[in-house]
Swiss-Prot record:
The lineage of its organism: Bacteria, Pseudomonadati, Pseudomonadota, Gammaproteobacteria, Enterobacterales. It comes from the Bacteria. It comes from Enterobacter sp. (strain 638). Residues 42-65 have a biased composition (Basic and acidic residues). GO terms for cellular component: plasma membrane. It is a single-pass membrane protein. The chain crosses the membrane at residues 4-24. Residues 39-65 are annotated as: Disordered. This is UPF0370 protein Ent638_2968. Belongs to the UPF0370 family. It is found in: Cell membrane. Keywords: Cell membrane, Membrane, Transmembrane, Transmembrane helix. It holds the Pfam family UPF0370.
Length: 65
């Protein structure tokens, strides 16, 4: 078990290389042209910043000093 305490980082690197190879292999199977052709429509985005628009504290441009 002495070797494990010295060379644990090699096992981590082997694990990360395996994960990386599996990700590359899975990404090769994705057909991006088919996905883009049948892309679903996104619903309209609603943010909650519209209530801040009413609290406009900016000075008016045509005010005289």
């Amino acid at each position: 078990m002495d070797w494990l305490s010295k060379y644990w980082w090699i096992l981590v690197l082997v694990f990360l290389v395996g994960v990386l190879l599996n990700v590359i292999k899975d990404l090769k199977r994705v057909d991006h042209k088919k996905f883009l052709a049948n892309k679903p429509e996104l619903p309209p985005h609603r943010d909650f910043n519209d209530k801040w628009d009413d609290d406009d504290n900016w000075p008016k441009k045509d005010q005289k000093k």
